[in-house]
């Protein structure tokens, strides 16, 4: 796989102001792209990339300028390819995104409104005005937002600009899940049993669900990305699922039509990437496995799938192409299938856009999908035949989110990235991101930080590289889901390929609790923390004596330092305390012998508390750790993705701990707290109402997802502290019970 590179001149920073309800425009200096060899370039900030082995013909006719109607990582991704092809780029942004990376990377930038997507990125009129003002010849919609909006595609065509995606009729045919099922059936694509029509209200939803037979999947006809979807196992869940999904669909897509189909228990989610042009050519670019999901949203994807043999791959690909040709498809798209344990596959939906997880297909085929979208939109034919599409190695994508994985596998988090270092130095790593150190993760948009991609000669190598990359990924300032990702990639079932869409609840039935360490690993973490503390004390002892001569150094690092250390215990248990002794080998501050429980552990490396990443040797084995917290008597060590608070106290300090009172635990069953920042959509109770345990009290929306908040006990409502439309912070008390 070639790793293409080029250097871009630095672009001067510019502030972009956005007047309320008014379109404003700012043009920046052009950035220069000089590709040193075929492929997609990088700028100096980005390090090495993995995109494509297909070259760029700079003599081929192309667009002069395109506008990217999106934000974040996907806008940056499109800009990179456009620049490599010599195409100028225009970014659009909301007022809060004025200093975002995609704005800085583009040649021009236009502010299209306020932070809420409905007032900016979804404003078709303002995007069209930006196209006219900048003279952009075409628009790439990315994914989400307007990417599957037929009105937008049609309006662009009327305005004389190209939509870098499929024609509006294909979007309409495939975007409506009810209509797309009928087309897929006619195209002889394998189908899931279900009701072929719109579900108008709750009672009818229950009636249809009973006829199909529980469990059923209730989902939005215009949906995607896991939004507007619920699984129901009984009448009660069908009613609630219908109502919540309908509200979510209206909010996310502006279309609340619902459908119901049979839910296939324990399926795999496998999709086929397709690429079509306007000359009747259509290719399938092999499959991606997307079974690791939470709330119907993908967490880790891989390509190819370990479950799909060559003949099945061919059949899935051929059916995907049959469907594409049936609707006159003419761009990149994805046909999604559910696959049962017997390798029967059923059509799920077609995404008429560039898929989030497209990078792993690019890694195994060497085809830059964005490049081909730009070529096809201009009118060129595809450069390959089906026989020329390769399958080289294996690739994984981990979606790194600003989410708390300990809360429902990932409740969104907000904040500013105070420290941010991507692991681009690791072999076979690609990082698709739209943020940088100092960027803000807000409540208005998807909390995706980065798509971390690794490629290897085989599945094992790609997984090992992912493990190393996650260990070296430095993120401070926001809560993130790397602990969950890191635990998954080392978990036995996942590494063997034994996965379904139920993987997360089956492997983590009580929710994600963090990586469980073996006794040997516990001692490794404790020994490392003790060695760090001993080095800190030794250096402090040097400064007690103002004589900086070598003799002082030797004395400080020749002592044996004694501690009592422990890791947090499970609730209701006392932590196991370990007597630890640390000595330095020949006075070397970076070579320590740690005695713990009668076992000696040799640790070497840069034993510094100030490094973002510590790469060390423990008894000759290489491990990577991070120090993510420091306070008196405690060091928080990030090991295998999970933070562990290690208590490291001098012996004399331990005796005083018995006099320290523990904090009284707060009874949280009497209050309903906001689990994250967001907006209140529904309040279902008022003061004085009697409620039962588990009853829905409040519905809130954050980062385009609706969350139902329930009573923690049976009782009377004492106070309701919020109203519909209110914006709340994490931990805010919404409802109080007596």
Curated annotation (Swiss-Prot):
<comment type="pathway">
    <text>Metabolic intermediate metabolism; propanoyl-CoA degradation; succinyl-CoA from propanoyl-CoA: step 1/3.</text>
</comment>
<dbReference type="GO" id="GO:0004658">
    <property type="term" value="F:propionyl-CoA carboxylase activity"/>
</dbReference>
<feature type="binding site">
    <location>
        <position position="351"/>
    </location>
    <ligand>
        <name>Mn(2+) 2</name>
    </ligand>
</feature>
<keyword id="KW-0443">Lipid metabolism</keyword>
<feature type="domain" description="Biotinyl-binding">
    <location>
        <begin position="663"/>
        <end position="738"/>
    </location>
</feature>
<dbReference type="InterPro" id="IPR005479">
    <property type="entry name" value="CbamoylP_synth_lsu-like_ATP-bd"/>
</dbReference>
<keyword id="KW-0436">Ligase</keyword>
<feature type="binding site">
    <location>
        <position position="261"/>
    </location>
    <ligand>
        <name>ATP</name>
    </ligand>
</feature>
<dbReference type="Pfam" id="PF00289">
    <property type="entry name" value="Biotin_carb_N"/>
</dbReference>
<dbReference type="GO" id="GO:0046872">
    <property type="term" value="F:metal ion binding"/>
</dbReference>
<dbReference type="Pfam" id="PF18140">
    <property type="entry name" value="PCC_BT"/>
</dbReference>
<feature type="modified residue" description="N6-biotinyllysine">
    <location>
        <position position="704"/>
    </location>
</feature>
<feature type="binding site">
    <location>
        <position position="349"/>
    </location>
    <ligand>
        <name>Mg(2+) 2</name>
    </ligand>
</feature>
<dbReference type="InterPro" id="IPR005482">
    <property type="entry name" value="Biotin_COase_C"/>
</dbReference>
<feature type="binding site">
    <location>
        <position position="351"/>
    </location>
    <ligand>
        <name>Mg(2+) 2</name>
    </ligand>
</feature>
<dbReference type="InterPro" id="IPR005481">
    <property type="entry name" value="BC-like_N"/>
</dbReference>
<feature type="binding site">
    <location>
        <position position="349"/>
    </location>
    <ligand>
        <name>Mn(2+) 1</name>
    </ligand>
</feature>
<feature type="active site">
    <location>
        <position position="353"/>
    </location>
</feature>
<dbReference type="InterPro" id="IPR001882">
    <property type="entry name" value="Biotin_BS"/>
</dbReference>
<keyword id="KW-0496">Mitochondrion</keyword>
<dbReference type="InterPro" id="IPR000089">
    <property type="entry name" value="Biotin_lipoyl"/>
</dbReference>
<dbReference type="InterPro" id="IPR013815">
    <property type="entry name" value="ATP_grasp_subdomain_1"/>
</dbReference>
<keyword id="KW-0092">Biotin</keyword>
<keyword id="KW-0479">Metal-binding</keyword>
<feature type="domain" description="ATP-grasp">
    <location>
        <begin position="181"/>
        <end position="378"/>
    </location>
</feature>
<dbReference type="InterPro" id="IPR016185">
    <property type="entry name" value="PreATP-grasp_dom_sf"/>
</dbReference>
<keyword id="KW-0460">Magnesium</keyword>
<dbReference type="Pfam" id="PF00364">
    <property type="entry name" value="Biotin_lipoyl"/>
</dbReference>
<dbReference type="GO" id="GO:0005759">
    <property type="term" value="C:mitochondrial matrix"/>
</dbReference>
<dbReference type="InterPro" id="IPR011053">
    <property type="entry name" value="Single_hybrid_motif"/>
</dbReference>
<comment type="subunit">
    <text>The holoenzyme is a dodecamer composed of 6 alpha subunits and 6 beta subunits. Interacts with sir-2.2.</text>
</comment>
<feature type="binding site">
    <location>
        <position position="336"/>
    </location>
    <ligand>
        <name>Mn(2+) 1</name>
    </ligand>
</feature>
<feature type="domain" description="Biotin carboxylation">
    <location>
        <begin position="62"/>
        <end position="509"/>
    </location>
</feature>
<dbReference type="InterPro" id="IPR050856">
    <property type="entry name" value="Biotin_carboxylase_complex"/>
</dbReference>
<dbReference type="Pfam" id="PF02785">
    <property type="entry name" value="Biotin_carb_C"/>
</dbReference>
<feature type="binding site">
    <location>
        <position position="177"/>
    </location>
    <ligand>
        <name>ATP</name>
    </ligand>
</feature>
<dbReference type="Pfam" id="PF02786">
    <property type="entry name" value="CPSase_L_D2"/>
</dbReference>
<feature type="binding site">
    <location>
        <position position="349"/>
    </location>
    <ligand>
        <name>Mg(2+) 1</name>
    </ligand>
</feature>
<dbReference type="GO" id="GO:0005739">
    <property type="term" value="C:mitochondrion"/>
</dbReference>
<keyword id="KW-0464">Manganese</keyword>
<dbReference type="InterPro" id="IPR041265">
    <property type="entry name" value="PCC_BT"/>
</dbReference>
<feature type="binding site">
    <location>
        <position position="336"/>
    </location>
    <ligand>
        <name>Mg(2+) 1</name>
    </ligand>
</feature>
């Amino acid at each position: 796989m070639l790793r293409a590179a080029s250097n871009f001149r630095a672009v001067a920073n510019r502030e972009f102001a956005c007047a309320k309800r008014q379109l404003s425009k700012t043009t920046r200096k052009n950035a220069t792209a000089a590709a040193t060899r075929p492929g997609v370039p990088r700028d100096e900030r980005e390090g090495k990339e993995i995109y494509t082995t297909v070259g760029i013909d700079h003599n081929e006719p192309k667009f002069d300028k395109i506008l990217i109607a999106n934000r974040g990582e996907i806008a940056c991704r499109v800009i990179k390819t456009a620049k490599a092809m010599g195409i100028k780029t225009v970014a659009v942004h909301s007022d809060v995104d004025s200093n975002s990376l995609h704005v800085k990377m583009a040649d021009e930038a236009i502010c299209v409104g306020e932070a809420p997507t409905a007032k900016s990125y979804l404003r078709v009129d303002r995007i069209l005005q930006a196209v006219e003002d900048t003279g952009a010849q075409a628009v790439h919609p990315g994914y989400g937002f307007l990417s599957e909006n037929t009105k937008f595609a049609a309006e662009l065509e009327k305005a004389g600009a190209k939509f870098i995606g499929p024609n509006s009729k294909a979007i309409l045919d495939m975007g409506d899940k009810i209509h797309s099922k009928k087309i897929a059936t006619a195209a002889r694509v394998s189908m899931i049993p279900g009701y072929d029509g719109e579900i108008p209200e709750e009672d009818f939803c229950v009636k249809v669900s009973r006829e199909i037979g529980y469990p059923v999947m209730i989902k939005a006809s215009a949906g995607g990305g896991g939004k507007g979807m619920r699984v129901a196992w009984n009448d009660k869940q069908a009613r609630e699922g219908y109502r919540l999904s309908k509200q979510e669909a209206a909010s996310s897509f502006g279309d609340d039509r619902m459908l119901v189909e049979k839910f296939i228990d324990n399926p795999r989610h496998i999709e086929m990437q397709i690429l079509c042009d306007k000359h009747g050519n259509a290719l399938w670019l092999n499959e991606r496995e997307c079974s690791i999901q939470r709330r119907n949203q993908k967490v880790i994807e891989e390509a190819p799938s370990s479950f799909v043999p060559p003949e099945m791959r061919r059949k899935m690909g051929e059916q995907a192409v049959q469907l594409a040709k049936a609707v006159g498809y003419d761009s990149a798209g994805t046909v999604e299938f559910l696959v049962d344990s017997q390798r029967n596959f059923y059509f799920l939906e077609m995404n008429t856009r560039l898929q989030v997880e497209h990078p792993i297909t690019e890694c195994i085929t060497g085809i830059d999908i964005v490049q081909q979208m730009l070529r096809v939109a201009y009118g060129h034919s595809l450069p390959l035949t089906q026989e020329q599409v390769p399958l080289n190695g294996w690739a994984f994508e981990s979606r790194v989110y600003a989410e708390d994985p300990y809360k429902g596998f990932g409740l969104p988090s907000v904040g500013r990235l105070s420290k941010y270092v991507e692991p681009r130095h690791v072999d076979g790593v690609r990082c698709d991101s739209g943020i940088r150190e100092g960027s803000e993760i807000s409540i208005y948009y998807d909390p995706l930080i980065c798509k971390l991609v690794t490629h290897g000669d085989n599945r094992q190598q790609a997984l090992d590289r992912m493990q190393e990359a996650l260990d070296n990924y430095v993120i401070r300032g926001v809560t993130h889901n790397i602990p969950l990702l890191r635990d998954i990639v080392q978990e036995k079932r996942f590494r063997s390929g034994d996965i379904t869409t139920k993987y997360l609840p089956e492997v983590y039935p009580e929710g994600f609790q963090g990586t469980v360490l073996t006794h040997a690993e516990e001692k490794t973490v404790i020994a490392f923390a003790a060695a760090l503390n001993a080095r800190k004390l030794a250096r402090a002892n040097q400064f007690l004596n103002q004589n900086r001569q070598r003799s002082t150094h030797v004395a400080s690092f020749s002592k044996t330092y004694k501690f009592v250390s422990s890791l947090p215990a499970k609730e209701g248990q006392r932590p196991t305390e370990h007597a630890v002794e640390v000595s330095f080998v020949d006075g070397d501050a970076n070579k320590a012998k740690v005695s713990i429980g009668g076992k000696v552990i040799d640790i070497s490396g840069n034993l510094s508390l100030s490094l973002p990443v510590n790469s060390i040797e423990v008894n000759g084995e290489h491990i990577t750790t991070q120090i993510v917290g420091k306070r008196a008597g405690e060091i928080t060590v990030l090991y295998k993705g999970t933070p562990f608070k290690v208590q490291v106290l001098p012996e004399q300090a331990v005796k005083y701990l018995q006099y320290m009172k523990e904090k009284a635990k707060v009874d949280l069953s009497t209050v309903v707290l906001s689990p994250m920042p967001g907006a209140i959509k529904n309040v279902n109770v008022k003061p004085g109402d009697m409620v039962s345990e588990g009853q829905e009290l409040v519905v809130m929306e954050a980062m385009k997802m609706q969350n139902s908040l329930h009573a923690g006990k049976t009782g009377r409502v004492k106070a309701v502290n919020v109203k519909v439309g209110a914006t709340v912070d994490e931990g805010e008390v919404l409802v109080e019970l007596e």
